[in-house]
C-alpha cells in the first residue's frame, strides 16, 4: 500500500492495476506459505467463519485471533521502519494514513459497512466452496487470487477493501503511535467499520454455506 499511496513512488506503476495484482498475489503467497501450518488463517474473519461452520476448534479461536493481531502489528512496524523517509516526505495526510489503514471515499458509514459486508461475504464464500470441493492446490490458489483481486477491482474504490479486522486496526494503531512527520488523524472514529463489517460478512457467508452444503 505504501507504493500505492506515497508521492515519490506511487507513480512508478499504474497504481490501481498493481494494487490489485499485489493484493491478490500477497494473499496467494500467504496461503501457500502458511496453509500447511495453520490453514492460512491470518484473518480473524476467516477464523470466526470456519468456527461458525464447525471446521475450526473453539479452543483455538482466541489464540489465533491474538496471533493474527500480533502478526499484523509486527508487519505494520516493519512497514513504518522501511518507508519512514517516504512517509515523512508525503504532504498528503490521507496518503500517509492510507499506507497503513483503509480510508472510505465517502462519509456514509452505513454504505461503507454494507460494502465491506458484501466484499467479505463474497471472498469467504469462495473459500468455503474451495474447502468443500477440495480442488488441486494450483486451482485453489488461482481462485484465491481472483477472489481477492476481483474484490479490490469491484469495491476497492469505496472503502479500500479492508476484509481483515486485524490488518486494518493494528496498522491504524501503528500510524497513531509511531512518529510520522506532519501526520494527521488516524481516524479511529471510522475504525469500527473495517473491524466489524468483515466479521458480519464472514458470518453471513457461513450461514449461506451451511444452508446450501
From Swiss-Prot:
UniProt motif (NPA 1) ranges: 43-45
Keyword terms, alphabetized: Cell membrane, Membrane, Repeat, Transmembrane, Transmembrane helix, Transport
UniProt GO MF annotations: glycerol channel activity
Domain remark from Swiss-Prot or TrEMBL: Aquaporins contain two tandem repeats each containing three membrane-spanning domains and a pore-forming loop with the signature motif Asn-Pro-Ala (NPA).
Membrane-spanning segments: 22-42, 63-83, 112-132, 138-158, 188-208
Protein name stated in the entry: Uncharacterized aquaporin-like protein HI_1017
Gene3D superfamilies, per the entry: Glycerol uptake facilitator protein
Cell compartment(s), UniProt: Cell membrane
SUPFAM superfamilies: Aquaporin-like
Amino acid at each position: 500500500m505504501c507504493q500505492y499511496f506515497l508521492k515519490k513512488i506511487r507513480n512508478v506503476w499504474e497504481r490501481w492495476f498493481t494494487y490489485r495484482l499485489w493484493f491478490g498475489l500477497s494473499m496467494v503467497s500467504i496461503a501457500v506459505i502458511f496453509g500447511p501450518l495453520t490453514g492460512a488463517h491470518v484473518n480473524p474473519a476467516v477464523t470466526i467463519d470456519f468456527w461458525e461452520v464447525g471446521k475450526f476448534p473453539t479452543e483455538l479461536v482466541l489464540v489465533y485471533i491474538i496471533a493474527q493481531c500480533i502478526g499484523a502489528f509486527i508487519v505494520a512496524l516493519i512497514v513504518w521502519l522501511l518507508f519512514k523517509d517516504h512517509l515523512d516526505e508525503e504532504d498528503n495526510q490521507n496518503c500517509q494514513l492510507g499506507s497503513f489503514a483503509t480510508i472510505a471515499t465517502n462519509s456514509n458509514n452505513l454504505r461503507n459497512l454494507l460494502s465491506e459486508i458484501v466484499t467479505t461475504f463474497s471472498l469467504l464464500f469462495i473459500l468455503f466452496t474451495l474447502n468443500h470441493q477440495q480442488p488441486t492446490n494450483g486451482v485453489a490458489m488461482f481462485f484465491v487470487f481472483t477472489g481477492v483481486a476481483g474484490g479490490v477491482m469491484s469495491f476497492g474504490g469505496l472503502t479500500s477493501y479492508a476484509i481483515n479486522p486485524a490488518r486494518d486496526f493494528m496498522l491504524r494503531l501503528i500510524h497513531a503511535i509511531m512518529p510520522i512527520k506532519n501526520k494527521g488523524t488516524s481516524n479511529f472514529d471510522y475504525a469500527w467499520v473495517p473491524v466489524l463489517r468483515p466479521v458480519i460478512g464472514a458470518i453471513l457467508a457461513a450461514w449461506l454455506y451451511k444452508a446450501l452444503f
